[in-house]
Each structure stands twice: as structure tokens, then as C-alpha cells.
Amino acid sequence: MDLGKFEKKEYFVNRELSWLKFDERVLSEARDKNLPLFDRLKFLSITASNLDEFFMVRVASLKDQVHAGYHKTDIAGMTAKEQLKEISVRTHELVHVQYNTLNRSLIPALEKAGMHLVAAHENLTEAQSAFVDRYFEDNVYPVLTPMAMDSSRPFPLIRNKTLNIGALISKKEKSDKLNKKDKAGELLFATVQVPSVLPRVVQIPSKKDGDTTVILLEEIIERNIDKLFLSYDVICAHPYRIMRNADLTIDEDEAEDLLVEIQRQLKKRQWGEVIRLEVEDKMDERLLKILKTEFDIKEADVFEINGPLDLTMLMKVYGADGFDAYKTPRYQPAPVPEFQNEKDIFQVIREGDVFLHHPYMSFDPVVNFVRQAAKDPDVLAIKQTLYRVSGNSPIIAALAQAAENGKQVSVLVELKARFDEENNIVWAKKLEKAGCHVIYGLVGLKTHSKITLVVRREETGIRRYVHLATGNYNDSTAKLYTDCGIFTCDERFGEDATAVFNMLSGYSEPKSWNKLIVAPIWMKDRFLSLIEREAENAKKGLPALIRAKMNSLCDPKIIAGLYYASSCGVQVELLVRGICCLKVGVPGISENIHAVSYTHLRAHET
């Protein structure tokens, strides 16, 4: 299969720009007036959370490339500097649409629904003002730490993603002698962090019975900010927020202890290079100039925002009581028929493979599989991979119990699961303390497979039970994300699962596989061979179809292979959740390819 002619840069979409298109699709859900109002709030919050991570990881990585003098182009022919320039334009446009959606569509609709968001503390009634001031004195003031900047106090370190209020203050003519060096009328900079330990969305009395009124914590602080600087006049005060480079740089070959090295790098995450500054669009120019200078940030990375900073807080508004009529009813996963009224999960699996489709089917059988294995006296060993788990994970508890019950328990905990590193370090230590053998995977690779192997002693001998799945062993997100899994005791899967764990924990590399296709060594070649098979079928006039679901499609060889298949007449149907670097509809190249966005499940059919 000669793919050379299909690997030209004009046939590919830049990875980062494709991701921004994905976030735009999520934003389109927030703009869709056919959806329940509070669902739209949730989607808008998700777009903001997505954009935060995009800047902290992807934009940060591109800036690192520019700083390092890296000039090579990506598969779409763009340098890092060119990508950053285009990203700045696109993200400013996206943020503009976010706030237009909030201000022109969502807030008016919320008002009609009886939910009032006080945009400015100046709009409070007398009764609301009294409540807010009392709330400040009782709950907020004791937590605040105002910090000034002068010759003896340098600009303070501002943590990543924190919301802060910057102020320009001027010493009063008649004041105490605390700051003798400050001249009356001279402008000074001060800042105070909006405490993340306090609720950002605060409910206050409503004008009308039955309505709900909320105000943001930063508005409460702004209203009372003069109480933090008693000897000074507050000239202006405005919120701001920064985003820092949060991508971990770990040399796994040099690291003597991966867990310790990741812990060390995590401490640096809060203090990486500032890559984005968000401010109110009405911020005093003198204050803005100070922030841009101190953070050493370019104009292209400043976002002047018409509304509250950090829209992830809308998830708190979504959670307000009394508005169920404006939300999609919570879906209740259906019980898995094979496991109903059955206490012995192993007997069910022996009777036949069981396919699970989450969240439509309950995740309980997966949890119960590990729980029963932990208690079953005939179970000799449990092996499992963990990427992301819930905060109070029943899976972790069951694995710890299994080890305490004397079973051989081996767990691969992926320490490099982005933004779950700290959680996974905690779980790894807990499992080790319980007696589990904890491993961290292969150097230079993330282990993203979801696999559990239970080795059980039975009358006929040793039998291996396997659970394979997409997604995570996370009982919370399993109620939200679309994933699939299978239970089996087919010995071919058992042999393959054993080989996977031996490869992860030691130096064993299987020569062949019975049923599994494992990345990164074997999967790409297998997919390319399947693509070529369909292309040959099309050439012979035989039925030829490729239908695939995936998280992202970025690999240039796979994309070129799909172009080749399309040019041979193969119908290609792609469901791609996020990034898609493939261009559809290119004459002679991808005319037979149809690609749409979708949810989390990954599957491949040829």
C-alpha cells in the first residue's frame, strides 16, 4: 500500500485547530435553545474547562517549542509560532461567543426561570447589601490575605488558575504611621486572592419569594475591599486570572523513582510560565499595564472579558436546587440482565461472554466482579490497570481488601494520567500499604488500557476471567461517559491478558497475540492491514466498508491509509469524538469519507 501521495500537508488539519473546532461544537450545545436551559449552562461550563486545559497543556507546549528554537512543521505544515498566532485569533473569537451566549441568551432565560445572577454588587438592594456585608465580615474577611507591592515587597507569586482581585490604592492624607515611605496620592498595586476554600457562588435573599438569587464571591470582596486597606483610598479594583504552563516535563530514563519525580514536578505546576491572562474588559488601563508587565505576557495572550471570569463556576449554578424542570432528567442505567438475581458472577461469565454498554447499562457488575474476586477463597490472583478512578473508589477498596485477604494483587497505576497525577499517587501509596504489588508502567509510555485479570482455582483447573473495556475504572464517570466492556473466560483472552501484565511488569514481549491488538507496537500495523484489505476488496468489486469510532484521529499513516482506501472506492464512516486531522471531501482523496463528532466509546469494524 503506497501512501506517499496521500501524506501531503494540504491533506491534513492542524491538531490544535481541530481541537478548537471540537470545543466550538460543545459551545454550540450551549447555544442550542432546544436543549434544557440548565443543560446549556453545563455545556458552557465544559467549554471553559476544556479551554483551560488546552492552554495549560497544548498552548504551553507550543510556547516551549518556540522558546527552544524549534522550527519544524507539523503534519499540516504549520510551525509552532504559526500555530500560536492562529490559536490566539480562534480562542479570542471563541471566548467572545462564550460570553455573548451567557449575556444575551442564558442570563435573560435564567431570569425568566427565577434564577438571578447579580452581575455587579452595585445592583444589590438594601437588604441584599446588608446580607452580603455581614457574610463578608463573618465568612470571608478572616480568610483573606491582601498583598501590596512596593520596593520592599515584590510582586507576589500568583498560583495557576486562581481568581484574584487587583487594586490600585493611594495613601490617605491623614493616616497612621505604618507606611511612612508611601507618599499621599501615590498609586500602589495590591492584590488579594479570592479564596478557593469558600463557595464562589453565594446565595443571597431574593426580591421575590420563590426565586433564587446568587452573587459571586469576588463581587462580595470588591464591595468590601476598602476594609482591607484602611489607610488607603481604593482607586479601582478588578478581578484577574492567570493560566500557567502545567505540562509536566519528566525524563523517565533519568528518574530514579518515577513517583518521587512526578511529585516534584507537580509542585512546579503552580508556578510555570504565565501563558494566558484574563481580565475584566472594563479594567483600569494602569492596572492592566502592571499585570502585563509583571506577568511578562504579550497582548495576544490577554483576554478582556465581558462578564465573570472562569465560567467553570456555572457548574455550581447548574447544581442549584429547585430547577429540575430545566434539566435533562438524570439517566438511570439499566441492570445487566445476565447478572440479575445471580450471586456468583463467575458462573455467569462461564455460561457465556457478557457485553456491557455504559452508561446505558449499569457499571455495578464491574465493581462486583472485583469485590467478589477479593472475597472468593478460590481466587488466587487479581491483576488490574488503573488510569482514572473516582474519589472514593470501590475498586481501590476491593483491591486493598483482596491483598489483605492474602491474594496476589498486582495493579498498574498510571501516574501520568494528566491532572489526575496527585490522586493516582495517593491511590498507589494506599494500595502498596495494603500489600498490593504496584507498578507504574513502561518508560516513555502511558498505559491507557482497561483490563482486569482474575485467576481462579476450579475443579477443572486454573481458569482466567477477564474484563476488557474502554473508558476508566471510575464508577462516577461510568454514569456519564459512553464506553463498552466485555466479560469473558475465553482462554485465548486469558493468555493475552496474562501476556499484557507480564509485559507491563517485566521485560516479557509476546511474539504473537490470540485476540488482542496492543499499541503501540502491533495496533497500527494491524489497522493498516485491515484498511488495505478493504481497499483490495473495493478494487475487486467486492463490498468494502470501514466504520470506526475513536477519541481522536491524528496519526498521519492511518489517515493516509484511509485516504488510500477512499480513493479505491471504500466507503469510510468515522465517528470521532474530538480531534480529527483528516480532511473530508478532498477530490480524489477523501470523497468517500464521512466523519462526524460523537461521544466516548471506541470501536472498529471492517
Indicate residue ranges for each PLM-predicted region.
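Conserved helix-loop functional segments at active or binding sites
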Residues: M361-P365, F369-D376, R388, Q401, ...
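Active-site core of PLP-dependent enzymes with the aminotransferase class I/II
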Residues: S390-A397, K557
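Hydrophobic alpha-helical scaffolding
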Residues: F12, E16, G77, H92-H96, ...
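Conserved small/polar residues in nucleotide/adenosyl-binding loops
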Residues: V26, F43, T599-T606
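N-terminal non-catalytic structural scaffold regions of very large proteins
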Residues: D2-D378, I396, Y564-S566, G578
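Signature of lipid phosphatidyltransferase scaffolds
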Residues: T213-F229, Y240-I242, L453-L528
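PLD/PLD-like phosphodiesterase catalytic module centered on the HKD motif
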Residues: L3, I107-H121, E126, M147, ...
